[in-house]
A protein has these predicted regions:
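Terminal low-complexity/charged segments
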Residues: 1-170
Length: 170
């Protein structure tokens, strides 16, 4: 573990319920969903992690508890360090609290979590789909999403897709 990161990890372990995994010089800190906003605020305000450089999820289907890990990658430019926070989330009704009050950049990334993985973000200011058209069923980055499906029609590709569709002939 990076020497600059050790006191930060130790402070998180003392104050929050965490577990740590290290793999190839990367440190992953596991945080409970109900603690993530407090941890993000602490890291931003006390330890200069001013940049939320990534926010995504990983699906561990068919495992259900936890099925997902929501992954926050934070960077401190002043300290030249990066840390990954992982929030395990169950598969039945996946929910996490919004981080938009801590990092504005979380807005669209959290909408992507809802759209692509079906992870509900509680308290989000604009919980609309961001990538898929309204009315799309399912969440394409889930491992149980069917691979053979009809391509969604957007305004720019309606004619192109229409030409490929088989229509009933009389």
């Amino acid at each position: 573990m990076d020497k600059k990161l050790e006191p930060i990890v130790q402070a998180l372990q003392e104050k929050y319920t965490t577990s740590i995994e290290e793999f190839r010089d990367e440190v992953h800190i596991f945080i409970k969903a109900e603690q993530i906003v407090d941890v993000l605020t602490l890291l931003r305000d006390k330890y200069d992690f001013e940049l939320l450089s990534a926010l995504t999820a990983s699906d561990y289907w068919p495992q259900q508890s936890p099925r997902f890990h929501v992954i926050y990658q934070l960077s401190s430019i002043a300290r030249n360090i990066t840390v990954q926070l992982r929030v395990p989330v169950n598969g039945d009704q996946p929910k996490i609290p919004t981080a938009t009050r801590v990092y504005d950049v979380a807005n669209w990334r959290e909408r992507e979590l809802l759209d692509m993985f079906g992870i509900e973000v509680e308290g989000h200011p604009d919980p609309r789909r961001i990538l898929m058209p309204e009315g799309t069923e399912g969440h394409p980055l889930r491992k149980d999403f069917p691979l053979g499906y009809e391509e969604p029609q957007f305004t720019f590709n309606i004619k192109e897709i229409d030409l490929r569709k088989p229509y009933a002939k009389e």
